[in-house]
Amino acid sequence: MTDLHYRCGWVALMGPPNAGKSTLLNALLGQKVTIVTPKPQTTRNQIVGILTDDDAQTIFMDTPGLTQVRGRLSKTMIQAVWQSLNQADIIMPVLDAHLYIRHPEFLDRDLAPVAQALASEERPMIVVVNKVDLFGDKSRMLPLLTRLHEMWPRADIFPISALHKDGLADLVELIRKKLPKGQAQFPEDQISTAPLRFMTAEIVREKLFMHLRQEVPYSVAVDVESWEEDEERGQTVIHATIYVARPMHKAMVIGRAGQSIKAIGTEARKDIQELVGGKVHLELWVKVREHWTEDTAFLRDLGLMAE
């Protein structure tokens, strides 16, 4: 029987790098569906997370951070953002309050072009002001909130802390009210559209970001080459290759006496076991593939570029 009051729709999370979009999505779902690191520009693909309750199904799209385009990979990531916007019923920019209060001059640099591009939008828009937990004196936020109202006069401006989950229940309620009426598009127990292989590769990439310094994690890619169920041993056997752009990066990923790759593999295996709900045997290999970020065919093979 069709529920005429049920709501269902797509919400595009967008904004500058390191604003907390992925942290917010994981917090809204109460489960990890996208990787989170302290480094900006971690997300490369559109990640879909699904929140279902008795009254609504909200389909969130976590997108790469909006930044200046540098190279084919970066261009592909920015294209993913605008493709998500075309699909969205609600547009939800997410920004780092702490950054813009400390550096108000960055506000027009980062957000004015986005506000201008969306000026004619008639779809609902919620501007999420994240990381408000970093301010004891909330009055310091008033100039920022005032400027955001000027930039997005029709939008709801909503302060939250994704890390501490402050304000999230009210945010979910606001989103639900703005969703169009319609029936659920996914089963009620599904929380993401990402295949297990993709999520496994993302977990390995997250650990690379956590262990490697400077520019190295930005020049690595992970490809899960095989996935087999070993019923005799009761485990999932996964072979993944880490591609790096330079020989020196390979040495850094492996580490002295293999200590770095061992730590990356151990931490990744624990998260993958939680993901699959069972024992995992993970083997990681490191290969050099120079200029892979400019290789269109390779980017397509990795799922980083549409066919």
Swiss-Prot record:
GO terms for molecular function: GTP binding; GTPase activity; ribosomal small subunit binding; small ribosomal subunit rRNA binding. CDD domains: Era, KH-II_Era. GO terms for cellular component: cytoplasm; plasma membrane. Its main location: cytoplasm. Residues 160-162 are annotated as: G5. SUPFAM superfamilies: P-loop containing nucleoside triphosphate hydrolases (SSF52540), Prokaryotic type KH domain (KH-domain type II) (SSF54814). Monomer. NCBIfam families: era, PRK00089.1, small_GTP. This is GTPase Era. It comes from Desulfovibrio desulfuricans (strain ATCC 27774 / DSM 6949 / MB). The lineage of its organism: Bacteria, Pseudomonadati, Thermodesulfobacteriota, Desulfovibrionia, Desulfovibrionales. The gene is era.
